[in-house]
Amino acid sequence: MAAQRIRAANASGLPRCKSEGTLIDLSEGFSETSFNDVKVPSPSALLVDNPTPFGNAKEVIAIKDYCPNNFTTLKFSKGDHLYVLDTSGGEWWYAHNTTEMGYIPSSYVQPLNYRNSTLSDSGMIDNLPDSPEEVAKELDLLGGGWTDDQKESGRPYSNNPFWNGVRTNPFLNGNAQPSTDELNPKSTVDLLLFDTGTSSFTESSSATTNSTGNIFDELPATNGLQVEQPVKRDNPFFRSKRSYSLSELSVLQAKSDAPPTSSFFTGLKSPVPEQFQSREDFRTAWLNHRKLARSCHDLDLLGQSPGWGQTQAVETNIVCKLDSSGGSVQLPDTNISIHVPEGHVAPGETQQISMKALLDPPLDLNSDRSTSVSPVVEVKLSNLEVSTFIILEMKVSAEVKGDIFSKSTVVLQCLRSDSKEGPYVPIPLAYSYGDTIQVQLDNLEPCMYLAIVAQGPNILYPSTVWDFINKRVTVGLYGPKHIHPSFKTVVTIFGHDCAPKTLLVSEVTRQAPSPAPVALQLWGKHQFILSRPQDLRVCMFSNMTNYEVKANEQARVVRGFQMKLGKVSRLIFSVISQNPNELSDFTLRVQVKDDQDTILTQFCVQTPQPPPKSAIKPSGQRRFLKKNEVGKIILSPFVVTTKYPTFQDRPVSSLKFGKLLKTVVRQNKSHYLLEYKKGDVVALLSEERIRLKGQLWTKEWYIGYYQGKVGLVHTKNVLVVGKARPSLFSGPELSTSVLLEQILRPCKFLTYIYASVRTLLMENISSWRAFADALGYGNLPLTFFCRAELDSEPERVASVLEKLKEDCNNPDNKDRKSFQKELVMALLKMDCQGLVVRLIQDFVLLTTAVEVAQRWRELAEKLAKVSKQQMDAYESPHRDRNGVVDSEAMWKPAYDFLLTWSHQIGDSYRDVIQELHIGLDKMKNPITRRWKHLTGTLILVNSLDILRAAAFSPADHDDFVI
């Protein structure tokens, strides 16, 4: 029966799997001709006009013996020729030896002719022959005949995985000739594993691989005939020593569809022997060229960032510590968790649990009778002195079918191993219902690997385990954070439901160090039930005419054996915009079809937005927006509420205290830098640090309260002792009213635009009465602020604001007040902190623009390294008829720049003011030396949280405006 089954399988012309072995039915008699019944594609059969599905196999040669330890790997000896079908496994390649198929370790083989003189890159001229005849003989082998009729002849190079019709050995010919097959159109449906691809990502590097990281695609094998120029045998250099090089490949690799370019690299060609009078001159020139070629890459092509050589999913992991009370640890974005019962470790001890999801299963877990239905979960424990077990719970990607026969044939089984590659042993399930399972783990080890498989040990051919389960396959679409005029997406197919949020894409080059990998984001994923492992055709389309998927990349094929082995498949699609000036988000439709072109599933994914138009980036390190900052900066014109809190004048309790380690007396007095004496105690408003320049260099500072003043104290001069108030603390107690008065000191020195202030208040204050009370106009009627009756609440708010402006600017008023300070104080008493920080940020940017004025270009370079063209663009709207900007109007381009720059920084008002202060400190003659109030503003915005926490009742916060 086994032999009949093998013959039936081989009747279709497909090679057998290693797991079937070489079986002969002895009952039918044994003869030597029995082996001839096993038919597989030969190397020559792979090169016919109508190739088999394995027509893109790449020939390699074994460099050492390999004896397999499981049924899925292939045995071979040193010197054997193998034919690789898939290199996506990284360390393991899928290959056949014209008899059997299986996995081989990639380190045990080399591409055919890898050490040939045209491909070696040893960096030396070695293996010198003893006679000219030996060189000529070798060149005969490499270049064919020496006659002139070779112009019309051709020679196939399909067996050489690196050959693509470009000659790189200067001892053969210095002129690169295209192959005839480059003129032939490619099929629009390319195999995933061996796409010879002409897309830009294969051009971006000298050795950029395709979506599977296949090294054979660095220089794709051609299927046609190479057009060669005759090799001049009478040239004396061809009678001399041979040389080896692979260096020029990064320069000479040109694709048939690439337009000619005129750049520095266009003229970077190998020297031709005929150009030199002696062998030594040519050798020196050629070695110099190779040295240059090894260190250079075509920057025009590399500029098509990012490189797209290899894709690697970022494995999801988590590390957590639990004490004796137990708890649960869940892998982020997955349905995998570990439950630790109470009393697992002794009181006072901890258990550190590390979990990681490995996406590609080992080879042993998938066959006709078994298939993996979960990622391999790596569990590491720090403490083995435990008294209880732990429970692993997860959802799997398959369910056994509901009929009795399926339930009796296939079961879900948990396998465990101490090594990632196995061997795996089964352990019983504690609980199983539908697609949810629980496993009780005892006999704990420091490192364990666990996987769930659907197994049917008694399944007979031709049935497989897939016939008895409903297995879900996950399709994920990954792309960049923002879309661009030309970008690439990666479609991944997982044999389980664990799709990571990030996919790393790195460019493969022969350059060291390699470029940093680019992280792609998961745009969307979709699951569908796959009835059996089969070839899948994945197509992608755009719903907008402005965007199109490259024609030769609209469809990709995933081989059925990859689905059977549970390997993650990665397919790259290039998307191009027809009009780069009209970028917008759009929808991509992904279709998955079977080998009969029937749609199995399809889904749509919305792309992200294009990036902001300005390329200005913050110069400093970005700090994450604090949770309590998020709601404060968002202002809405639709806030409708009449209830405002009452500002409470009470002591500030949430202070920390520190002992001063040094006496500081400042020669240049500043309102915002404290002077103090060694041994005294200072109260710290928080332990958050502020960065600004001291006398010589940038330092870190705490906001402190000492002897009735709020200011900055150098962090190295303070020893933080905690929240307990020391008995040595002297000076008046810090209350909310004192703190409010102290931090508002710089407000009266800030410049403002009244119209913008009026608009903001009209949009965000919903009660003119509360606003008037906070300003000190208590119990005054509306007619006191305006003569006519106003119908809308925003107009009433504007009338109150107008009254404040008149009072502050009245020269007859003996006690003149600052408009900015009174306004900010009133808003803080109303708990409108979001509105305050918006006003403060606008005030600071405008004041800085006015103070910097004509020096704004220097500030722009310090903040964002703005180019001269960008600076001119900021000034162009403000130029007069003579094309110059008046000195009194120079604040306008400065303000335009600062507004644009602040939007690039983000929503954190603290970061905007902090980075602005650092940028001003970096100027040659910084204005912060004479204009200290930006430092006070930095103290203000960093003290708002503690003021708000002390002045208002937390129980009422939910009912108030921002």
Swiss-Prot record:
InterPro entries attached to this UniProt entry: DEATH_SH3BP4 (IPR056183), SH3-like_dom_sf (IPR036028), SH3_domain (IPR001452), SH3BP4_C (IPR056181), SH3BP4_SH3 (IPR035456), UPA_SH3BP4 (IPR056182), ZU5_dom (IPR000906)
Record remark on domains: The SH3 domain mediates localization to the clathrin-coated pits and vesicles. The SH3 domain mediates interaction with DNM2 and the cytoplasmic part of TFRC with a lower affinity. The SH3 domain also mediates interaction with RRAGB, RRAGC and is required for the negative regulation of mTORC1.
Domain ZU5 per the UniProt entry, residue ranges: 316-453
Phosphoserine PTM positions: 131, 245, 250, 278, 295, 636
CDD domains: SH3_SH3BP4 (cd11757)
GO biological process, one term: cellular response to amino acid stimulus
Signal peptide: none
Subunit: Homodimer or homooligomer. Interacts with DNM2, EPS15, clathrin, the adapter protein complex 2/AP-2 and TFRC. Interacts with the Rag GTPases RRAGA, RRAGB, RRAGC and RRAGD; the interaction is most probably direct, preferentially occurs with their inactive GDP-bound form and is negatively regulated by amino acids.
UniProt function note: May function in transferrin receptor internalization at the plasma membrane through a cargo-specific control of clathrin-mediated endocytosis. Alternatively, may act as a negative regulator of the amino acid-induced TOR signaling by inhibiting the formation of active Rag GTPase complexes. Preferentially binds inactive Rag GTPase complexes and prevents their interaction with the mTORC1 complex inhibiting its relocalization to lysosomes and its activation. Thereby, may indirectly regulate cell growth, proliferation and autophagy.
UniProt-recorded name of the protein: SH3 domain-binding protein 4
Keywords for this protein: Coated pit, Cytoplasmic vesicle, Endocytosis, Membrane, Nucleus, Phosphoprotein, Repeat, SH3 domain
Annotated Gene Ontology cellular component terms: clathrin-coated pit; clathrin-coated vesicle; cytoplasm; nucleus
Superkingdom: Eukaryota
Domain SH3: 55-114, 653-723
